[in-house]
Structures are given as structure tokens and as C-alpha cells.
Swiss-Prot record:
Function, as annotated: RNA polymerase that catalyzes the synthesis of short RNA molecules used as primers for DNA polymerase during DNA replication. Also part of the exosome, which is a complex involved in RNA degradation. Acts as a poly(A)-binding protein that enhances the interaction between heteromeric, adenine-rich transcripts and the exosome.
UniProt name for this protein: DNA primase DnaG
PROSITE patterns: TOPRIM
Cofactor requirement: Mg(2+)
Organism name: Pyrobaculum arsenaticum (strain DSM 13514 / JCM 11321 / PZ6)
Gene: dnaG
Length: 405
């Protein structure tokens, strides 16, 4: 069993049987894709993982006679009712890739049992202490507890000693906020994978830049002009996946638990944010290349793409849709989907992919995922900062193709 990624209350242990040969990523992909939306956004596995309410899903897999069996481990920081719902949700999986599958929850372990025993023993000692010692003032105790909890929960992260929640390293996704007060508020309401910029007057901390390269990043900004300025500075040097915003006129540190949850549920992708900026009449530019990494320029197309349809008409059809189309080697349409779902599709799909046309921004993350799938052609509205493009992959912008028609 793999290491836990959160301080969990429960461990869901399930067994899956697949009538075919699959790997771990196929099983995990099926868990996310087939349960999405079944119980609403509050119980969506991706949302729960982003908030640190469930941990990294681990799979122990073994194959025999062309069939695959595996054990699935899901650490949960939810209450027992919500944990039971997640377990039942997992049992709803019916396929992995093209193969029929069945899932059975074996057990739900209470990981806090040992801790309870220790607490009871300690409580017995403290009862004796209370009887023997004069109790201090109640208000003083409460103030001490508040101070100790605050100090224990918010840690200093990286060489810049940035304020952060305790689960930044453990979680696959992080929430970036502006200041320490924002971190304290989010940690207080259960979001432990949060870290602060601590202002941008001296530039974006290198720790934030490094974290953005290896984790899924949501930037949570204040609902004022200052929040937008912070975001634009961050986009110059860091990779951002999603943007969440406090209600107009409010700061993140002022939000209630309900307001925080709503803002994070309503987060949008970077591509959607740029499209909104453009639609509202603001000049929205793609994030420029970080200074420490020279940007690789895309050459203009040297030869026309041999597609069996009019590319210029296709581009006109795609403009404004914020969607992507996936094609195989014969330029047969495999799938059409929102651009925000493209990274997950590339990471989990078993389809053969030759070309992608998308009304959005092609980021380095999309290029990396596409390269793993053997994609040869990407036609995109715009490109973000690209530092590494495979030699056998061609990337064309809509403008480039219009010029060559």
C-alpha cells in the first residue's frame, strides 16, 4: 500500500476485477471520469482531492490470464457518512477503458482508533492533574489553545519561509493566495494545501515557481483590482491551471467557509479567464516566458497540412467555442470536448490520437501530455510559453494557417 497523502480518518479499501489488461492509470482515470457529477460538485473526487479531503489514490495491481485484479486504497478525511458515500461511488464503476469491470468495497478502516486509545489514557492522567493542581483562568486556556493551534497549523515553507498549510507537499494540487491572513483563513476552514505569495513587490518567490511546475495550481485572488494585478504578475513566471476569485469587494481572508467553497467550485481554467478578459474588452495576453527559461519559438508552417477538409472553415467553426477536437491518423473525428477537459482526456484516453484542433491556449502541460500520446499536429488559437516541443510535433496557430491558405 502506498503512502498516505493526507492525515486521514478512514481508509477505503476496494477490490476491482477487469476483464482485460489495464494499468494503474487506466483504473484511476476510470474512477475520476465515471464518478464525475454523480453526486454533485461537493462530492466530486477531483474537488475533494484538491481540497485535501481525500488523499492520493493508490492501486496495487496484478494480472493473470489476460485479466486484471487490483486493490484500491483511498484515504479519506471526510466524516463517516461522506466516506461511505465515496465508497459507494467507487463501487459504481462498470468499465475500465474498453473492458467490463466490477468493484467491491472490502472494508473501511478507522485510522483513528489507536489515536483514540492514546487520548483516553492521556485524559486519565489529566483528570488526576486537574484534581491535584489549581486550574488557571478559562479564558487564558482558550487563548493559549487558539494561539498554539494557529502556530501549529500554519507552517513556513521553502527558503523564503512562505506561510503555508501543512499539506502543500502531500497534495497533488495547491491553492496559491496572497498573504498569511488568507492562509490562516483557508486552513481554519479545512483547506490545508494552501500557500501564500507574501506580496509581489520583490517578485514572485522561486518556491512558488517551482511548485507550479509539478503541481496542479489554483490561484485564489481577492475580488478587487489588486487581486487581478497579483494574478497577472504570477502568470508571467509560473504555470497556472485554474483561477478562483473572492466575491467583488471582498478579500480571501474575510470569506466564510461557504463563500470559500463556492469560489473554489466556480474556479475557471486559465484559457477561460483569458477569453473572458478578451470578451470584456480588456487586453488579455498569454503569460510570457519566465526569464530563466528561453522560449522556444514555433516556426511558421513550411507545408500545408494534408487534412480532408477545409482548415480555414474549420477554424472559423471552432472560434469562440472554447472546445477541442481530437482526430486519428485518417483525420477522422474521435471526440469533441471543452478545452478545460483536454488535459484529463489526454492523460487517461486509450484512443490513438494524431491531431488536435483547439480554440484555446496550448500550454507546455498540453504539449507534454500530447507528446506521450504520439500527437503529431496541434492547431491552436494561441500558444503559451513553450520550452520543449518534440521534433516530430508541429504546432500551428489559427493565424498562421489563415496566412498560408
Amino acid at each position: 500500500m502506498g503512502a498516505l497523502t493526507i492525515v486521514a480518518k478512514y481508509m477505503i479499501v476496494a477490490q476491482i476485477e477487469v476483464n482485460g489488461s489495464v494499468d494503474k492509470s487506466d483504473i484511476i482515470g476510470a474512477l475520476f471520469s465515471q464518478t464525475e457529477g454523480l453526486l454533485g460538485k461537493d462530492m466530486d473526487l477531483r474537488e475533494l482531492q484538491m481540497m485535501g479531503r481525500i488523499g492520493r489514490i493508490e492501486v496495487d495491481i496484478f494480472e493473470k490470464n489476460g485479466k486484471t485484479k487490483a486493490k484500491i486504497y483511498i484515504p479519506s478525511n471526510l466524516d463517516r457518512y461522506e466516506t461511505a458515500l465515496v465508497a459507494a461511488l467507487v463501487e459504481s464503476i462498470e468499465r475500465v477503458g474498453p473492458y467490463p469491470a466490477s468493484v467491491k468495497v472490502i472494508e473501511i478502516r478507522d485510522l483513528r482508533e489507536e489515536k483514540r486509545k492514546k487520548i483516553i489514557e492521556k485524559a486519565k492522567e489529566l483528570v488526576k492533574l486537574i484534581e491535584e493542581e489549581i486550574l488557571p483562568d478559562t479564558k487564558e486556556i482558550i487563548e493559549r489553545l487558539k494561539e498554539d493551534v494557529a502556530k501549529a497549523e500554519v507552517v513556513e515553507y521553502g527558503p523564503e519561509r512562505l506561510p503555508a498549510g501543512p499539506d502543500v507537499d502531500k497534495s497533488d494540487a495547491i491553492i496559491i493566495v496572497e498573504g498569511r491572513a488568507d492562509v490562516v483563513n483557508l486552513v481554519k476552514h479545512g483547506y490545508r494545501n494552501v500557500i501564500a505569495l507574501e506580496g509581489i513587490s520583490r517578485g514572485v518567490p522561486q518556491t512558488i515557481i517551482d511548485l507550479s511546475k509539478k503541481k496542479n495550481v489554483t490561484v485564489f485572488i481577492d475580488g478587487d483590482k489588486g487581486g487581478e494585478l497579483v494574478l497577472k504578475e504570477l502568470l508571467k513566471v509560473a504555470h497556472v491551471d485554474y483561477i478562483a476569485r473572492a466575491p467583488p469587494g471582498k478579500e480571501v481572508e474575510q470569506l466564510t467557509a461557504k463563500e470559500i467553497a463556492k469560489a473554489l467550485r466556480n474556479k475557471i481554467s486559465l484559457e477561460e479567464w483569458l477569453a473572458q478578459q478578451k470578451a470584456s474588452g480588456e487586453r488579455a495576453e498569454a503569460p510570457p516566458q519566465p526569464a530563466q527559461q528561453p522560449q522556444q519559438e514555433q516556426p511558421a508552417p513550411q507545408r500545408p497540412i494534408q487534412a480532408p477538409f477545409d482548415l480555414e472553415k474549420k477554424i472559423e467553426e471552432m472560434l469562440g467555442t472554447l472546445e477541442a477536437e481530437i482526430y486519428d491518423q485518417n483525420w477522422t473525428l474521435v471526440k469533441r470536448l471543452p478545452v478545460r477537459e483536454l488535459p484529463d482526456f489526454l492523460a487517461t484516453s486509450g484512443d490513438s490520437i494524431y491531431a488536435i484542433i483547439l480554440d484555446g491556449i496550448t500550454t507546455q502541460r498540453i504539449v507534454d501530455l500530447a507528446a506521450k500520446k504520439g500527437v503529431k499536429v496541434i492547431i491552436t488559437a494561441r500558444t503559451g510559453p513553450l520550452t520543449k516541443v518534440p521534433e516530430d510535433m508541429s504546432i500551428y496557430t489559427f493565424e498562421q494557417l489563415k496566412k498560408t491558405e
